Amino acid sequence: MAAELSMGPELPTSPLAMEYVNDFDLLKFDVKKEPLGRAERPGRPCTRLQPAGSLSSTPLSTPCSSVPSSPSFSPTEQKTHLEDLYWMASNYQQMNPEALNLTPEDAVEALIGSHPVPQPLQSFDSFRGAHHHHHHHHPHPHHAYPGAGVAHDELGPHAHPHHHHHHQASPPPSSAASPAQQLPTSHPGPGPHATASATAAGGNGSVEDRFSDDQLVSMSVRELNRHLRGFTKDEVIRLKQKRRTLKNRGYAQSCRYKRVQQKHHLENEKTQLIQQVEQLKQEVSRLARERDAHKVKCEKLANSGFREAGSTSDSPSSPEFFL
């Protein structure tokens, strides 16, 4: 592509020349840097293959294998040229044709050989997490692996002073990690149903105690349904049945209270009426005594008047005289 771009301004415009240029397969040529660029950066292809943040001490059969690579660290080096990317990709495919099917051991060797391919590095990250978890329980197992020393060194200086916080600082587990490490990733967080069931399970004994009897009776149905969100159906039914029982009990108590109040009122009225009847009876007896007294008096007056009339019967003014 770079060759086509560089040849663009110098191409002739005749059809024969264009057909001659099109006969060439330019894609089979490797893209290389200019000699000036190579003179400015000698030995860069050897160090360009090394990924940022990695250490390498064992060379492989690379074009630069004649000069052993020393441990170097290049975290801030940036790849700004497209030609370097093409050159690295083609060079890695020539040296490692089975890059897509690497095992963790091959990934370790590829990492030591300074080949920046993302997929083998991901496999190596999973292998590194499993190995470091094994190293946490057994202090000296890393001598059995050829690249375990590099894998352990890549954890950084924070692995040794914070060894007791290993599980918090370890990389996220992958398919090669233990099931105990995969448990937090398989369950990222409780859903709404899990939260509701956990709330209901945590308050099984206190669901009915959450609301007092007065609150259940005085609360409206809409407000009660809003407070009962998150509880199970059985608990809601049981709480509503308790509310219905309390309302029926309250209604029965109010009816009983009304009946008692009415009974007391009737008893008071009865007592008052009885007292009035007694007063009336006393009045009747008093009137009867007065009547008897007046009757006796009238009889006495009548008897005394008849005697006076009998004494004067001989006179012409008496009534018997005219008869």
Curated annotation (Swiss-Prot):
Q: Which residues form the bZIP domain?
A: 238-301
Compositional bias of type Basic residues: which residue ranges?
Answer: 129-143, 159-168
Ordered alphabetically, the record's keywords are: Activator, DNA-binding, Isopeptide bond, Nucleus, Proto-oncogene, Repressor, Transcription, Transcription regulation, Tumor suppressor, Ubl conjugation
Instruction: List localization entries.
Output: Nucleus
Which parts of this chain are annotated as the region Disordered? Answer: 34-78, 116-210
Q: Where are the annotated segments for Basic motif?
A: 238-263
> Any keyword Transcription regulation?
yes
Q: Where is the signal peptide?
A: none
Compositionally biased intervals (Basic and acidic residues): 34-43
Note the Gene3D superfamilies from the entry: 1.20.5.170
Q: Which sites are covalently linked via Glycyl lysine isopeptide (Lys-Gly) (interchain with G-Cter in SUMO)?
A: K32, K297
Name the PANTHER family for this protein: TRANSCRIPTION FACTOR MAF (PTHR10129), TRANSCRIPTION FACTOR MAFB (PTHR10129:SF10)
Q: What's the record's remark on domains?
A: The leucine-zipper domain is involved in the interaction with LRPICD.
What is this protein's function per UniProt?
A: Acts as a transcriptional activator or repressor. Plays a pivotal role in regulating lineage-specific hematopoiesis by repressing ETS1-mediated transcription of erythroid-specific genes in myeloid cells. Required for monocytic, macrophage, osteoclast, podocyte and islet beta cell differentiation. Involved in renal tubule survival and F4/80 maturation. Activates the insulin and glucagon promoters. Together with PAX6, transactivates weakly the glucagon gene promoter through the G1 element. SUMO modification controls its transcriptional activity and ability to specify macrophage fate.
Q: What is this protein called?
A: Transcription factor MafB
Name the source organism.
Macaca fascicularis
